[in-house]
Amino acid sequence: MALDSESSASNRQGSRNEQDTNPRLTAALCLTALGVVYGDIATSPLYAFREALHNIAPDSRTPESILGILSLIFWALIILVSIKYLLIIMRADNHGEGGILALLALLRPWRGSPQHQRNVLIVLGLFGAALLYGDGMITPAISVLSAMEGLEVAAPQLTSYIIPATTVILVLLFMVQKRGTARIGRVFGPIMLVWFVVIALLGLNGIIHHPQVLVAVNPYYGINFFTDNGWSAFRVLGGVFLALTGAEALYADMGHVGRAPIRLMWFALVLPALLLNYFGQGALLLLDPHEAQPFFHLAPPSFLYSLVGLATLATIIASQAIISGVFSLTRQAIQLGQSPRLTLVQTSSEEIGQVYVPAANWFMMIAAVWLVLHFRSSDNLAGAFGIAVSGTMVITTILAFFVMRERWHWNILTAVAVTVGFLIIDLAFFSSNLLKITDGGWFPLAIAVFIFTLMITWQQGRQLLIQRIHKETESFQDFLQRIVTDPPVRVSGTAVFLTIHQHDTPPALLYQLIHNKALHEQVVLVTVITEEVPRVPAAERLEVMELSSGFHRIIVHYGFMQSPNVPVALRACETLGLKIDLDTTTYYLSRASLIPTDERPGMALWRDRLFAFMSRNSAWPTAFYHLPPEHVIELGIQVEL
């Protein structure tokens, strides 16, 4: 049955790819794009313009400076989101999937690249992924908090309840993650459709009262803003960037709905609605440059309570999108061998992409609640926002250069010109955000360094462990020859041994033979390989090889968006001529006990200890490979690092 569901998942992916090139996209798919993809960037009007203006002294908030900031927001949305992400970066899909790890896998730096290039790509990709974890903690905090701050305008007497209410909403949001979003996700799209229509109408109303604001589409005002304000204009870029914080999510979430629906909804609805609202806020600020909450003051007083409620729903949806994105990113990292095995819970029997990661969920919840309690306002929290996403954008641009050259075969001049053009803008935003380090920007950087250290240590430690075991293990060819020469006693049943190296004898097999002096009649060696593609169709999943003396080798292929299920794979082997009775099958696993030491070459001792700690606390292979616990025997081995 699980195999059938994977087949149907592959079929859904195939039909989605067909829709991706079909101009007659369904309304349902476009609504899904609104709910899944656009939540983050949709809620930026709550705080982006306000925070950009806060970097200007009150006596310098002239009409020219307001128009200058508005012009910067306009052209940033056009150049970075519309052109860079929607038209260029989203072409770099890995069999329909996007995101920085999918982009890294697309480049396949593990195979054939020069050593220095391989190291640079892996470090960039892993650090970019690590930065997104910081974004996953800050986005829920600042989004929900900024929505609740609408109470300051609607009901000033309720201001003292903003922090407690935000905390309660965040805790509830993270607590319901284990139930999945399959049901409530269906209403996300319609809610976001209402949100975009409302913010567009609010902005249009502001523009009608002050249509002169439309001159800000002229880039002259943005350029003039820099020439007139100098250093303070550079600081403003950190606030302007908040209008772009959901751009990376457009690429990361591409696998959910496909490229075409995302592009269609951006140009048909999302971009016009955002621009109307930003220009409406600009019109309001031209009339009152000292307005503290320009977004909420666009609404008539009678609509404020409804707007606060709608904004809260929109920010919850935005938070849900980034939380789900972190879960998906974590699964990719685990399957690609860049993270320890963590418990993964499939929350939908229909959508293979919906997964819940308890460890990541509680870590993000604690961090988000701490951020709210520590910073206490979205103004203060804005200092911590932006660094993670702007850093990821820089890394995405660099990785995209290699895609242009190696995958799209662009000539060097075109690739360099496009990359340098985007990098100049990306680095300007990133540098401006670095000025926020003392105001809270240290938090996402600290989280990124912490996560990156874990990921790079796990990856290198795993490689060292595999090398050490390989050196100390008998080749399977020699082992098989020994079995033929001196046959052991055979007992009924099937023994399954999981092995990483196809040409090595699994340590558990050696120890089982030494201690029991016998082998099962049927011995199956299983190697699970995670390919650098999101999904491997069920028809291409298995390779079955008959060896000799009752031995078979099975190679099982999965994509990095799939969860391995060894019993299901073994059951499917019957279609390839190998029948395995799962009721009489015993699974033998090797459990390595790691001994950190500084006597061997490799990592520093503290990293050896960190790797050993992660290995001890990673999810058991029994659960990870969906093995029945009552049929599993683990044999321990000691390995010096």
UniProtKB/Swiss-Prot annotation:
GO molecular function, one term: potassium ion transmembrane transporter activity
Compartmental location: Cell inner membrane
Transmembrane spans: 29-49, 69-89, 120-140, 156-176, 188-208, 236-256, 267-287, 307-327, 355-375, 384-404, 410-430, 437-457
Any Pfam family hit: K_trans_C
Chain intervals for the UniProt region annotation (Disordered): 1-20
Topology of the protein relative to the lipid bilayer: Multi-pass membrane protein
Similarity remark: Belongs to the HAK/KUP transporter (TC 2.A.72) family.
Entry protein name: Probable potassium transport system protein Kup
Lineage, opening ranks: Bacteria, Pseudomonadati, Pseudomonadota, Betaproteobacteria, Nitrosomonadales
